[in-house]
């Protein structure tokens, strides 16, 4: 499945319990179509105690969400935006904001 965001992009969550929050993409899972976003979809994981390592605890961490629930955030527009592809004069393909034409 093709994912429209990349690692280190700033995105806005458009649906779900974290709607309206922004965060940076930490990891992209193209096979499942999910993304891991910093500070979004926090879940509690019950850590079992090991003999040699750590004690048991409840750890809060991010869980992956579907890529269709996020949109790229444009710093110039200060809003979530759709993206378009544009080919520059030197032949490189870049992503641009559909509203203000700023490159990402």
UniProtKB/Swiss-Prot annotation:
The keyword rRNA-binding applies. GO terms for cellular component: ribonucleoprotein complex; ribosome. Keywords: Ribonucleoprotein, Ribosomal protein, RNA-binding, rRNA-binding. GO terms for molecular function: rRNA binding; structural constituent of ribosome. InterPro entries: KOW, Rib_uL2_dom2, Ribosomal_uL24, Ribosomal_uL24_KOW, Translation_prot_SH3-like_sf. GO terms for biological process: translation. PANTHER family: MITOCHONDRIAL RIBOSOMAL PROTEIN L24 (PTHR12903). HAMAP family: Ribosomal_uL24_B. Belongs to the universal ribosomal protein uL24 family. One of two assembly initiator proteins, it binds directly to the 5'-end of the 23S rRNA, where it nucleates assembly of the 50S subunit. Part of the 50S ribosomal subunit. This is Large ribosomal subunit protein uL24.
């Amino acid at each position: 499945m093709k994912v429209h965001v990349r690692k280190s992009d700033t995105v806005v969550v458009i649906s779900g319990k974290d709607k309206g929050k922004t965060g940076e993409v930490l990891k992209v899972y193209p096979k499942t179509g999910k993304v891991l976003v910093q500070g979004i979809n926090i879940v509690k994981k019950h850590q079992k105690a090991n003999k040699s390592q750590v004690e048991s605890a409840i750890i809060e961490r991010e869980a992956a969400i579907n890529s269709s629930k996020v949109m790229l955030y444009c710093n110039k527009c200060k809003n979530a935006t759709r993206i378009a592809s544009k080919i520059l004069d030197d032949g490189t393909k870049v992503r641009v904001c559909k509203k203000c034409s700023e490159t990402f």
